[in-house]
Every structure is written in structure tokens, then in C-alpha cells.
Amino acid sequence: VTTVQRQPNTFDAVVHYRFLTGDEADYVGMARSYQQYLIERDELHRVEFSNPNMGVRLEFLGGDKERVALWDQFIPMTTIAQMSDILGSLDIPNPEVIYYGWQPYGASNMPPTSLVLEGGLGSVNDLRALADGVKASGGHFSLYYDPQKAIAVWGENGYSIRSDIALAITNATVETFNRQYGYYFTLDALRRRYQPLVADIESQLGAGLALDSIGFMLYSDFREGHTLNRQEAIEAYQNLLAGSAEFTGWFSRAIRYLSA
């Protein structure tokens, strides 16, 4: 079994040491020191808000599936109509609304490559009206999506475990656990799924995607003929997301200044 990478990755590694003393020698001081480092590199900028009302993030679970005998059935948790009623009763200005588990059979099912909603939640027209209402109140509406993850459920449709899943240097599948167990897609499979979905949501819904993981998660792929190291993954993700930067929201750190 190969456990040592024969060809080293090509990149310049730089290590910065910062020594903290006195009141700054704690985790808060570390955060401030790193903040100052990003400011000095022109990577971090102060955002001025013209609206005094800070938006509140609200995440709704559409639903999920459960096994019944030999098939799955969808269990709705929050339909589009219910979500609209909740938002109306809260009457919060500038809400940041994220809808999780919107796809057919819900959160534990692979998202499609086009905008297809679970019928038990409502229609695309219903969702468009809701998104327009959120936007009119000064907020943003997004569908939750983790583009890197292939949900690992036996018999799951939508991808090939033989060709679409990234491999470690030991030829084992690269695994993850984020809300549910899964694998990581190869870059080709990620592109093939992400790009048409973005285009379809933009044309049909005019809303956004709340992207999980890809803003901070890097992994190498040693699949023969498709090798990709983490340094190369940064550039690939930057190029992939560049065309939809205003349309997508990253849950965590911006990958723009990360390095492997």
C-alpha cells in the first residue's frame, strides 16, 4: 500500500510566528493578532452597513425521509407556506433565510443538478414568491447546498462511487461527516453538479445558495488520471465560484486567502 506521496506538492510554505505578552496572551489576543495580519495584507476590510437593523439568520428544515418497509417516504417539517407564515409572524427586517432539506425526499437525499423541489413542500412558484418577499424586506433567501459532499447511503442515486468519489493516497474513499455521513466528490463531479444547479436556480428562482464546507474545506484526490492536491484545489474552487460570487454565500472562512 502506498502511503508516501512520490511527487511532492509544489508551493512555497511560509510560517509566521507571533509572540503575545501581557493581556494579549490569550485566545482573544490571538484572534486580534490574526485580524491585524489580515488587515495588513489587505485581506480583511471593514463593512459599513447603511441599515441600522442587523439581519437575523433563520434556517428552516424542509423535511427528510424515513424508511418504511421497502421504500422511503418523505416527512415534511416546514412547508413553504408554513415558512411564509412564520416569517410573517416574526416580521423581522433584513432576514437571512436559509432553506435546508428542500430537495426531493429531503435533507438526507442527494440534491439534484437542477431546481427540483420536494412536492410535499410546495411549488417553485411558491418558493419564488417567498424569496421575492424576503428580498423586499431587505433580506436574502438561499437554498442550503454542500457541493463537495456525496451523501453515503446504500443505493443512493445521482453519482457513481466508482468514478465520482475522491480517493486518498491509500486508494480509500475520502470520507466526511457534516450533518450526515458522506464522501467527497472529485473536482470533475463537483463541477458537473454545481454549475447547472446554480444556473437553474438563478434563472428560475433568482435566489441564492448557502454553500457549506467549500469555503474552508480542502482535500487531495489521488484518483488515477484525476489527481488534485489541496493547493490546486484552492485555485479550482476560486475559479468555480468566481462566476457566482454575488449569488452564493459561504458559511465560513473565505477561501480567497487560504493556503494548503
Predicted regions and their residues:
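Aromatic- and carboxylate-enriched substrate-binding clefts and catalytic-loop regions
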Residues: 94-260
